[in-house]
Amino acid sequence: MKKQLCALMAGAVMLGLAACGGEEEVQNAATATLEQNGVTMTMSFDAKGDVVTKITQESVIDLSGYTEEQIETLNATVDTAEETYAALENVEYSCEEEDGKLVERIVIPTDEDTLKEVVEQGLLQVDDENVTQLSLEATVDNLESAGWTIE
């Protein structure tokens, strides 16, 4: 009886720890898409509960209607963006031409320090510049009200 009680208590403790141990991170908990001026932007959010843990943004530009001069201007903009994002320790930036399209990808972890840095640099627009975390629900609501399609 004593062994069964101990096993039952151990099981209850493990269940309690699992329940209190925090929520699992969900990859692609929400995805927002916007098409504007020939650019398709997609933002995917990883989240733990309502807290965004990572933002992945992909922007795709179809270059088929662009002149050589316009492509050079785009490339200069990409060079500037590469320099800007390279200065940020935890943020990943890449931009490549694939099948006649320019594909830009930015990955931003939203830990407090990185979030503060990208907000200070003006690379992530938020209502409160002293933000320490992002709410998935509020972020999705704001994007939807700005015309983004939410999945």
Positions of predicted regions on the chain:
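Positively charged n-region of N-terminal signal peptides that target proteins for export
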Residues: M1-Q4, L8-M9
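Subset-of-secretome marker
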Residues: E23-E151
